[in-house]
Amino acid sequence: MGQFTVVSLGLLAMFLSLSGAKGDNCPASWISRNGVCNKLFPDRKTWLEAEKRTWKWSDRTSTNYFSWNQGEPNNVQDNENCVHLWAPSGYLKWNDEPCASLHPFICQYKL
């Protein structure tokens, strides 16, 4: 198996948009799309729990893509150091929030 990248998402809709054909190389219950395997884990975890030991992207590149909701990140009470996809934006925009917040998450790895 390749390195895992954990993406904390607060949504099921994003997972459903990944509904490509099931690949022969992905484990059962995983979905294959564009050369990667994806799986939604509905149990809720904090950002730190969900991405433990997988903090960096699997290819070690930094992101140059940002999709903050208007007025974000605002770091309310100097306690919002993690990000999730914001439901009121249709899960298209990011919102910063405390890292102890619980959300479903998706794991992904390259085939």
From Swiss-Prot:
Keyword terms of this UniProt record: Calcium, Disulfide bond, Hemagglutinin, Lectin, Metal-binding, Secreted, Signal, Toxin
Signal peptide residue numbers: 1-23
Keyword Transit peptide (UniProt): no
Summary of the tissues where the protein is detected: Expressed by the venom gland.
A GO CC term assigned to this protein in UniProt: extracellular region
Location of this chain's protein in the cell: Secreted
Single GO term (MF): carbohydrate binding
SUPFAM superfamilies for this protein: C-type lectin-like (SSF56436)
Binding site for Ca(2+): 80, 95-96
InterPro entries attached to this UniProt entry: C-type_lectin-like, C-type_lectin-like/link_sf, C-type_lectin/snaclec_domain, C-type_lectin_CS, CTDL_fold
Motif (Mannose-binding): 72-74
Primary subcellular site in the record, as a coarse category: secreted
Annotated ranges, domain C-type lectin: 33-108
Disulfide pairings: 26-37, 82-99
Summary of the function given for this chain in its UniProt record: Mannose-binding lectin which recognizes specific carbohydrate structures and agglutinates a variety of animal cells by binding to cell-surface glycoproteins and glycolipids. May be a calcium-dependent lectin.
Family assignment from sequence similarity: Belongs to the true venom lectin family.
Designated name of the protein: C-type lectin lectoxin-Enh2
Organism: Pseudoferania polylepis (Macleay's water snake)
